[in-house]
């Protein structure tokens, strides 16, 4: 019980650092203090939504999302969005992917494919599945998992953005 609070604080610091990394242009509020929860489209999960503000106006949103479709099981990401729903970036905050293979989902060469796109199901798949995303070599399952998590976040963002 003595270690629970420091572990929680370390996790929050890691999440806030990830939010800062995926929100283009920064923010002047504390997105962690303003966080809210939003249900996934199927209603089975609650995602954490961090609004980023500049001069009191929402300038972007970061969403903590997850998937159980990783090669190593559960994977958690923070995904950033511009107000038009375009992905600004993502950061993996937890995964059990294979070192040197699945962990390449965190490398710029793979991540850069997502920046500036608005996910649409018909193209938001790895090329092996008829989409436009180059999977990490020998880590197609991990690549698909990232897409699944980002798609969940995107669907939640679209639900949230109707209220902006």
PLM regions and their residue ranges:
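Flexible, solvent-exposed loop/hinge segments and secondary-structure transition points
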Residues: 1-164
